[in-house]
């Protein structure tokens, strides 16, 4: 048996020849298992240098890599984590699954879905395009946003800036110009999103949009939450409007976020990770309709926007910047209608194009307008820019003012309730002789 073991041992431990070098016999351990008759042979060649033997992996050539290559996944990660997580739904403890399709198990199938639906991106430069930003407006907005990104010692900074004022004074557009100037793409919300058929949905949406803005800040880009016409969605407009649970929860949610701006959680999902602070900008016409504790000074900083004569002239220069209207004519138009909002002058400019549209309609015929506008091979018509003279601007401006006065003066709703007549509308036509 000893001979048998020796034979086996001698065969298994024969010197291995690798690249011309033999294994040295001294490396073979001496053990009783192999027997005493084991031959120990010396190396015939000197030991090779370990630095001469290298294993090198060739880099992947993207030109040779094709989409049909079944081994493509070895070099590139082509898995979809979202779908992998979704497949595991039902096998994960429900403690880690959030309700209402807001947890990690809900697959985001398109990369476009990662871009927030409320993200507003601007393609304008207020310097190049000639838009006017009121200095007082810009100062208030820039200081508020900057303060919220600073850590000032022992100072409680209001998270919300409420910009309010008359209708059509350019509050939202001035905000957008300042955002574009600062390089901010805000997360947008409007008053229509502050009510829903489902109780609690608007409050959840505010938290969701706030966290989306916080994620953008976390990635190193400034952002803010911008809510248009907050009073129209969350305020009480007299006894005729109903105060719903959603109105109450929107006010309460904004109060809670203002008190805890770095700990905003979605309903049903709670973790201890803090989120960046996101400044909130809201606009409205009358903040007295909002819940009073929301607009107190510690939570909301208020700014009443009433454009001065210089502001109105500056904005109107931007409105008529492509029409070659002389500056002195713009000043005359602004001074002629001192009580009108800034939006009035935009409507005035649009009204001047009525003559061009009327001329085009008479050329093509009323019965073929649909074919020319919607189903035309030539594309939509193009108009030459009409010449805007001071007389034409004043004429159309007076027409707009007259229509405003009719709405305020006639008030047909009261007439309909009291008698079957058209009120003073017919009286005007009788006086003009056109009845």
UniProtKB/Swiss-Prot annotation:
It holds the Pfam family RuBisCO_activase_AAA_helical. ATP binds at residues 165-172. SUPFAM superfamilies: P-loop containing nucleoside triphosphate hydrolases. It comes from the Eukaryota. Its main location: plastid. One of its GO terms (cellular component) is thylakoid. InterPro entries: ATPase_AAA_core, P-loop_NTPase, RCA-like, RuBisCO_activase_AAA_helical. This is Ribulose bisphosphate carboxylase/oxygenase activase 2, chloroplastic.
């Amino acid at each position: 048996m000893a001979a048998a073991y020796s034979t086996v041992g001698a065969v298994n431990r024969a010197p291995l020849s690798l690249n011309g070098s033999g294994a040295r016999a001294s490396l073979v351990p001496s053990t009783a298992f192999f027997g005493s008759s084991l031959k120990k042979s010396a190396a015939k060649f000197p030991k090779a240098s370990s630095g001469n033997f290298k294993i090198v992996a060739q880099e992947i050539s993207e030109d040779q890599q094709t989409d049909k290559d079944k081994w493509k996944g070895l070099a590139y990660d082509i898995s979809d984590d979202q779908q992998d997580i979704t497949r595991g739904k039902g096998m994960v403890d429900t403690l880690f699954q959030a309700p209402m399709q807001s947890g990690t198990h809900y697959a985001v199938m398109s990369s476009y879905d990662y871009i927030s639906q409320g993200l507003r991106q601007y393609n304008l430069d207020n310097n190049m395009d000639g838009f006017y930003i009121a200095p007082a407006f810009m100062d208030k907005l820039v200081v508020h946003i900057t303060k919220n990104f600073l850590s000032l010692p022992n100072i409680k900074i209001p998270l919300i800036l409420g910009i309010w004022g008359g209708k059509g004074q350019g509050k939202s557009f001035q905000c957008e110009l300042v955002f574009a100037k600062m390089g901010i793409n805000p997360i947008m919300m409007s008053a229509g999103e502050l009510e829903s058929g489902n109780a609690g949905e608007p409050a959840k949406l505010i938290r969701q949009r706030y966290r989306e803005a916080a994620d953008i800040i976390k990635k190193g880009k400034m952002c803010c939450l911008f809510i248009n016409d907050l009073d129209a969605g969350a305020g009480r407009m007299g006894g005729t409007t109903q105060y719903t649970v959603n109105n109450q929860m929107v006010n309460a949610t904004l109060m809670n976020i203002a008190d805890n701006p770095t700990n905003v959680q979605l309903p049903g999902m709670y973790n201890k990770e803090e989120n960046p602070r996101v400044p909130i900008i809201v606009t409205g016409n009358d903040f007295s309709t909002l819940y009073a504790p929301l607009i107190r000074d510690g939570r909301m900083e208020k700014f009443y926007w009433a454009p001065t004569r210089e502001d109105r002239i500056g904005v109107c220069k931007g409105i008529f910047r492509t029409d070659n209207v002389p500056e002195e004519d713009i000043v005359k138009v602004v001074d002629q209608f001192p009580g009108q909002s800034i939006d009035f002058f935009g409507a005035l400019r649009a009204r001047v194009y009525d003559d061009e549209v009327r001329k085009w309609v008479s050329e093509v015929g009323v019965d073929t307008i649909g074919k020319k506008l919607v189903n035309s091979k030539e594309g939509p018509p193009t108009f030459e820019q009409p010449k805007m003279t001071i007389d034409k601007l004043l004429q159309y401006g007076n027409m707009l003012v007259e229509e405003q006065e009719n709405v305020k003066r006639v008030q047909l709703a009261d007439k309909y309730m009291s008698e079957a007549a058209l009120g003073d509308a017919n009286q005007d036509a009788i006086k003009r002789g056109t009845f």
